[in-house]
């Protein structure tokens, strides 16, 4: 479990936009927002970067990395979620992200799985 945690800390998300390559540590990313194939990645202290991709490409790249779809335009990093509300969720950055009714069940399941894995790793270290 410790190996997995260390590997996750070193993971980077890379992207290209206008001929430049961007690199962001995965743990700094709070969410992705996509509008007509233009993706905005939100990270750090309110920073953003943009690149082109489809939601399907993005979901494929982030598969198994604790990101979940909340809405047709949003993909959220599960460790950033602090509160579920009726039609949105609050991130630890203070931002509010919409939840589409279509994604509610799968989002709650993904979050529950994430919390279970977190508790498993924590209890192994005791």
Where are these regions (language model features)?
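C-terminal structural segments of small proteins and small subunits
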Residues: 98, 105-106
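A short, terminal or domain-edge coil/loop segment
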Residues: 65, 69-70, 104, 120-126
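DNA major-groove recognition helices of helix-turn-helix
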Residues: 58, 106-107
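Conserved binding/recognition cores within well-folded domains
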Residues: 1-99
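Inter-domain helical "communication" segments and dimerization helices
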Residues: 1-12, 110-126
């Amino acid at each position: 479990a410790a190996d997995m945690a260390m590997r996750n800390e070193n993971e980077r998300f890379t992207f290209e936009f206008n001929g430049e390559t961007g690199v962001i540590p995965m743990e700094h990313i709070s969410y992705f927002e996509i509008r007509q194939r233009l993706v905005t990645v939100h990270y750090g202290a309110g920073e953003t970067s943009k690149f082109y991709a489809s939601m399907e490409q993005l979901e494929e790249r982030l598969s198994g990395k604790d990101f979940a779809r909340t809405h047709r335009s949003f993909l959220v990093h599960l460790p950033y979620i602090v509160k579920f509300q009726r039609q949105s969720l609050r991130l630890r950055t203070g931002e509010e992200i919409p939840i589409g009714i279509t994604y509610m069940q799968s989002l709650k399941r993904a979050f529950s799985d994430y919390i279970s894995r977190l508790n498993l790793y924590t209890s192994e270290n005791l």
